[in-house]
Regions:
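ATP-dependent phospho-/nucleotidyl transfer catalytic cores
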Residues: 129-229, 238-244, 333, 337-357
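Conserved ATP-binding subdomain of kinase catalytic cores across diverse folds
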Residues: 39-180, 261-262, 303
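Juxta-kinase regulatory segment immediately upstream of eukaryotic protein kinase catalytic domains
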Residues: 1-33
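Glycine- and acidic
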Residues: 74-77, 130-135, 250-251, 267-275
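Active-site activation/catalytic loop segments of kinase-like enzymes and analogous catalytic loops
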Residues: 90, 255-297, 314-334
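Active-site acidic catalytic loop and adjacent metal/ATP-binding pocket
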Residues: 40-58, 65, 211-261
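Short amphipathic beta-strand and strand-loop transition segments with alternating hydrophobic
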Residues: 31-38, 107-109, 215-216
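All-alpha amphipathic helical-bundle segments outside canonical DNA-binding/catalytic cores
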Residues: 298-314, 345
Length: 357
C-alpha cells in the first residue's frame, strides 16, 4: 500500500486512514469516519477521527487523533518560524522511544522540511482527559508529573549527542533563534499595554526585568543539561479518569530542548498548583524529583544544586506567557491562561529570589 502523504484535516478520506493503519501494522479497511476538533492547542490543531470499518483487522482502533498545523494564520506562521512543527515530528521519530516519559503511540507522522506542513496521527488517549492550565492539577497528579519529569530528564542527562542535532532547540547545531532581545522587549511592551488592567505592579516589575535579560537568562544555567519539554504544563498532558486511561501522558513536543531539567519542574509546579499548595509540598516534590533522577542513573547532582536551578526556572513560564500571547491567534481562554501563567511565574520568581543578575 502507498505510504500516506501529508494532508490537512479537510483532505483526509477513508483510503488515507486505511493507509495510516497499515503504517502502524494493522491490516484493515476504513469504510467511513467522523471527525471532531479536540484539545486547546495554541500552535497546532487536533482532530479525533472515529472510524467505521469495512474490514476490521486485529488491533484496529476505534479512533485516532490527528495533529496538524494551526488553522489560524498567525499561529501557523509562528509554528513555522519557530520550527515547532518540524521539531515535534523529529521528536517522535527519533527521541520518544528512549525518552522514558509516557507519550502516545504514533501511527504515522511526517513533515515537509520546506513548508513545515506536517501530520501526526496518534492513539486516542480517551477516556483520559486533557489537563487544564486554568483549573490546575491535584497534588496526586503533581506527584505523577514530577516522576515523569525525572524520568524524562534522566533519559538524556548530560547527553552531548543532542548538541549535534539541528532540530533540538538549544543545541550547538541548532540555527540561531529568529527571536532576539529587541523583539522580546517589544513583545513585553505590547503585552503590558494590552493587559495593563490585569497586571499586578510586582508582575510588571518582573516583566521589566525578564524582558531586558532574554539572552542572558537562556544562558544562565550552570549545571548539567538534558532533554527537556520546555512547555511542561497541564494543557500538554492527558490524565486518567475514573473511566480509565494512562495515569499521565505527555504531549505537544513542539518546543523540546537540550536544556535545564529543573526549569521544566519549575514551569509545571509554578503554573499548575495553587501557590499555597505548592509552598506546602514543594520540598517533598523536589525530593521526589531528585529520587527519580537517581533511580534512573543520574549521579553527582544534589539537592543544593536542584534548589538553585529550580528557583531560577520559572522565568521560562513567564517568558512563554507574554511571548505566546502576542504571537498566536487571540482567544478569551488564551487571555485568561496567559495571565494565569505569567502571574504564577512571577510569584514563584519573587519567592525564590530569582531576580538576581
Amino acid at each position: 500500500m502507498t505510504r500516506p502523504d501529508i494532508r490537512e484535516p479537510g483532505d483526509i478520506d477513508a483510503a488515507w486512514l486505511t493507509a495510516v493503519l497499515a503504517e502502524g501494522g494493522v491490516d484493515a479497511e476504513v469504510r467511513s469516519f467522523t471527525a471532531r476538533a479536540v484539545g486547546t492547542g495554541q500552535i497546532g490543531d487536533s482532530v479525533r477521527f472515529t472510524l467505521d470499518y469495512a474490514r476490521r483487522g486485529e488491533g484496529a482502533p476505534d479512533s485516532l487523533v490527528g495533529k496538524f498545523p494551526a488553522a489560524g494564520a498567525e499561529s501557523r506562521a509562528t509554528g513555522v518560524a519557530l520550527g515547532n512543527y518540524l521539531r515535534e515530528v523529529r521528536f517522535y521519530q527519533h527521541l520518544a522511544p528512549k525518552a522514558r516519559v509516557h507519550t502516545p503511540r504514533i501511527w504515522f507522522t511526517d513533515v515537509d522540511e520546506a513548508s513545515h506542513n506536517f501530520v501526526l496521527m496518534m492513539e486516542d488517549l480517551a477516556p483520559a482527559e486533557q489537563g487544564d492550565q486554568l483549573r490546575g492539577v491535584t497534588l496526586d497528579q503533581a506527584r505523577l508529573v514530577t516522576v515523569e519529569a525525572g524520568r524524562l530528564h534522566a533519559s538524556h542527562w548530560g547527553d552531548d549527542g543532542l548538541d549535534d542535532l539541528p532540530w533540538v532547540s538549544g543545541s550547538k547545531a541548532a540555527p540561531s533563534s529568529p527571536v532576539g532581545d529587541d523583539a522580546v522587549a517589544m513583545l513585553w511592551m505590547g503585552f503590558k499595554d494590552r493587559y495593563a488592567e490585569r497586571l499586578k505592579p510586582e508582575w510588571t516589575e518582573v516583566g521589566d526585568w525578564v524582558s531586558t535579560r532574554y539572552s542572558w537568562l537562556g544562558q544562565r544555567h550552570d549545571g548539567p543539561r538534558c532533554l527537556t519539554h520546555n512547555d511542561f504544563r497541564p494543557d500538554n498532558m492527558m490524565f486518567a479518569t475514573a473511566a480509565g486511561g494512562y495515569p499521565v501522558t505527555v504531549l505537544d513536543w513542539q518546543s523540546f530542548a537540550y536544556g535545564a531539567g529543573p526549569t521544566d519542574l519549575a514551569y509545571f509546579l509554578a503554573g499548575a498548583l495553587p501557590g499555597d499548595v505548592r509552598r506546602a509540598h514543594e520540598d517533598a516534590l523536589l525530593a521526589l524529583y531528585l529520587d527519580t533522577l537517581r533511580a534512573n542513573g543520574v549521579t553527582g547532582y544534589g539537592m543544593a544544586d536542584l534548589r538553585r536551578h529550580y528557583g531560577q526556572g520559572a522565568y521560562l513560564l513567564f517568558l512563554t506567557a507574554f511571548f505566546a500571547a502576542m504571537v498566536v491567534t487571540r482567544t478569551a481562554r488564551g487571555d485568561d491562561m496567559f495571565i494565569q501563567m505569567l502571574g504564577s511565574a512571577a510569584d514563584h520568581m519573587i519567592e525564590h529570589g530569582a531576580l538576581r543578575d
